[in-house]
């Protein structure tokens, strides 16, 4: 679960380009 949540956060971060 932790890894999946991390991937989701990275994906949303890249989509919003606010890393």
From Swiss-Prot:
InterPro entries: Antimicrobial_frog_2. Belongs to the frog skin active peptide (FSAP) family. Brevinin subfamily. Expressed by the skin glands. The keyword Plastid does not apply. One of its GO terms (biological process) is defense response to bacterium. Keywords: Amphibian defense peptide, Antibiotic, Antimicrobial, Disulfide bond, Secreted. This is Rugosin A-like peptide. The keyword Disulfide bond applies. Its main location: secreted. It is found in: Secreted. It comes from Pelophylax saharicus. GO terms for cellular component: extracellular region. Disulfide bonds join 13-19. Stimulates insulin release by BRIN-BD11 cells in vitro. Has antibacterial activity. It comes from the Eukaryota.
